[in-house]
């Protein structure tokens, strides 16, 4: 068996407007599909950034993770050209970031920030 690549990653968010503002308007994802699913009482968004697809289920009644170190998805990481410049851009959009760190395993700069539902997101050179 040979797996070619990751096709998509799925996250669950609570608020449609916040999700669109954050992922589309601020982070630059494109909406490729949007479906309101009455049977599941949610909205399914398929977003794209480069070759990567992010599938988002907007479920207003979804519980939040109590803390990030639970079993399952820990965080999403995005590769960027320049962490320092990206941090400035995020901060200008009103998105708080942690201090920039040096990843001793990769030899690259990186830091974290959170989406509106507190999902940790990483930028990494």
Residue positions per predicted region:
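Vicinal oxygen chelate
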Residues: 1-5, 30-77, 88-114
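Short, conserved charged micro-motifs
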Residues: 83-87
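Conserved beta-strand-loop-alpha-helix junction that forms the acyl-donor binding cleft
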Residues: 13-15, 38-39
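Conserved active-site tyrosine of GNAT-family acetyltransferases
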Residues: 19-24, 90, 118
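Short beta->alpha transition motifs characteristic of CBS
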Residues: 12, 33, 123-125
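Short hydrophobic/aromatic beta-strand micro-patches
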Residues: 10-12, 77-79
């Amino acid at each position: 068996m040979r797996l070619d690549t990751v096709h998509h990653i799925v996250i669950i968010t609570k608020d449609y407007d916040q999700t669109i503002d954050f992922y589309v308007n601020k982070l630059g994802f494109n909406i490729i599909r949007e479906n309101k699913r009455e049977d599941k009482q949610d909205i399914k968004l398929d977003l794209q950034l480069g070759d990567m697809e992010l599938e988002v289920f907007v479920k207003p009644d979804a519980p939040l993770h109590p803390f990030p170190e639970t079993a399952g998805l820990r965080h999403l990481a995005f590769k960027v050209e320049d962490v320092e410049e990206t941090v400035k851009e995020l901060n200008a959009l009103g998105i708080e970031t942690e201090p920039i760190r040096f990843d001793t395993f990769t030899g690259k700069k990186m830091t974290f920030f959170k989406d509106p539902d507190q999902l940790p997101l990483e930028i990494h050179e």
